[in-house]
């Protein structure tokens, strides 16, 4: 019996892939650092064993899958080589796996995770679908027709894939530690477009995506009239969003979604366009759109006393705009408070003015210290450089969150890609202690 061993199983992509292989009735195990990580929950629920790193974990007959963070000199990878066991890097293994299905890569600077989750949910209503989401969620079905997966542009990782379809949500300058500028990002997406085998579903409202050249049909979606799939007559309600879809200027159908903000409409439109292209029954699509419950760390809400607390992964100005817009739509009468932790010094420095502009759309802003990456130096930048660009912004630590209690009936959005959740946890604990 083949045993799949993951070197670095707690990585978000790695844990998702491990879940998929397990669900497909394979024997799966893995190793990693002993520090607890949020991806462990899904692995433990499935009974997948997580071991400490040890060269003795490697045995004859295993299939070794290694995360990109671990060099060839890692003790387990070295042990595999000594036993002449091939080591498959995560992206290459995933690329081979998806070739067995009708694969859909979801790419873009923003909206990948939410769109992948929505796509998988909708397609599941019509046909067996396996999926891999960048939030550490994976689901495998043995007789899958479709394989939906999130494909990240960072370090051009997505060039390991040759999918049947690609959804391209947008092209934006991010990851300034790797990409030189927007043109560098565009060229990565252009290279990806040439690897797609059947069709590309791209947001036509995005100026960069309009320039994409491909060997396959490119179907454009968006709000603009030139798009193949256009959303019109949008009703932004407190219980979701309703809109009409026109296909090449002819009315197609009216859809209701559970999401808020323009970005949620665009994500749904991409999914609707792909399903139309694959001849999935529109009634199935309509029903599945109304039952989608979202993905991890994307506008996740809870109520604490008279306040709404939202946990969101937004860490780029475009994403912050979208999250604050969604909060204003759902809670039009309430004060919106942004608690933001910048992620990496390089990104904060590159987008300093843009961060200030997007955060200013909240009624009140609190800033946590910058969450540095292990890959970078601090440089001269401090959180005060951002604070002075936002009127009334205050600094906050995980020991001073009690200041948030004064926002009676407020909507508190904790945003960031670092450890912003510890600030949220500290505040909730503060409120619970005060209640006793």
Curated annotation (Swiss-Prot):
Lineage: Bacteria, Bacillati, Bacillota, Bacilli, Bacillales
InterPro entries: Mur-like_cat_sf (IPR036565), Mur_ligase_C (IPR004101), Mur_ligase_C_dom_sf (IPR036615), Mur_ligase_cen (IPR013221), Mur_ligase_N (IPR000713), MurCDEF_pg_biosynth (IPR050061), UDP-N-AcMur_Ala_ligase_MurC (IPR005758)
Top EC group: ligase
Annotated pathway: Cell wall biogenesis; peptidoglycan biosynthesis
Residues noted as binding ATP in the record, renumbered to the chain: 108-114
Catalytic activity: UDP-N-acetyl-alpha-D-muramate + L-alanine + ATP = UDP-N-acetyl-alpha-D-muramoyl-L-alanine + ADP + phosphate + H(+)
Assigned keywords, A-Z: ATP-binding, Cell cycle, Cell division, Cell shape, Cell wall biogenesis/degradation, Cytoplasm, Ligase, Nucleotide-binding, Peptidoglycan synthesis
Name of the featured protein: UDP-N-acetylmuramate--L-alanine ligase
A GO BP entry: cell wall organization
């Amino acid at each position: 019996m083949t045993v799949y061993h993951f070197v670095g199983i707690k990585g978000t992509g790695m844990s998702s892939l491990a879940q998929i292989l397990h669900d497909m009735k394979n024997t799966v195990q893995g190793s990693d650092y002993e520090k607890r990580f949020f991806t462990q929950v899904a692995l433990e629920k499935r009974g997948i064993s997580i071991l400490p790193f040890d060269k003795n974990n490697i045995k004859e007959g295993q299939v070794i899958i290694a995360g990109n963070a671990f060099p060839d000199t890692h003790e387990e990878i070295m042990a595999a080589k000594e036993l002449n066991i091939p080591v498959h890097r995560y992206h290459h293994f995933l690329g081979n796996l998806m070739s067995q299905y009708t694969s859909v890569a979801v790419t873009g600077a923003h909206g990948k995770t939410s769109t992948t989750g929505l796509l998988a949910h909708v397609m599941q209503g019509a046909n067996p679908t396996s999926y891999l989401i960048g939030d550490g969620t994976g689901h495998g079905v043995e007789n899958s027709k479709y394989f939906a997966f999130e494909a990240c542009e960072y370090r051009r990782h997505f060039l390991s894939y040759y999918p049947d379809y690609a959804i391209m949500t947008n092209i934006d300058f991010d990851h300034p530690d790797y990409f030189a500028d927007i043109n560098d990002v565009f060229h990565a997406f252009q290279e990806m477009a040439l690897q797609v085998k059947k069709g590309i579903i791209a947001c036509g409202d995005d100026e960069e995506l309009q320039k994409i050249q491909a060997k396959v049909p490119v179907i454009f979606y968006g709000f603009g009239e030139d798009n193949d799939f256009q959303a019109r007559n949008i009703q932004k309600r407190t219980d979701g969003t309703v809109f009409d879809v026109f296909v090449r200027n002819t009315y197609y159908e009216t859809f209701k979604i559970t999401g808020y903000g323009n970005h949620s409409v665009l994500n749904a439109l991409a999914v609707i366009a792909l399903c139309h292209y694959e001849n999935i029954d529109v009634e199935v699509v309509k029903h599945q759109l109304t039952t989608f419950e979202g993905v991890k760390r994307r506008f996740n809400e809870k109520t604490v006393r008279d306040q709404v607390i939202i946990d969101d992964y937004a860490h780029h100005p475009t994403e912050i705009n979208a999250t604050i817009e969604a909060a204003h739509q759902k809670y039009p009468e309430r004060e919106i408070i942004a608690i933001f932790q910048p992620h990496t010094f390089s990104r904060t420095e590159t987008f300093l003015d843009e961060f200030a502009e997007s955060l200013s759309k909240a009624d009140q802003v609190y800033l946590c210290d910058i969450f540095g990456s292990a890959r970078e130096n601090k440089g001269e930048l401090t959180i005060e450089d951002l604070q002075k660009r936002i009127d009334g912004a205050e600094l906050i630590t995980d020991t001073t969150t009690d200041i948030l209690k004064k926002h009676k009936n407020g909507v508190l959005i904790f945003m960031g890609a670092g450890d912003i959740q510890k600030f949220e946890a500290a505040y909730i604990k503060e409120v619970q202690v005060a209640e006793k």
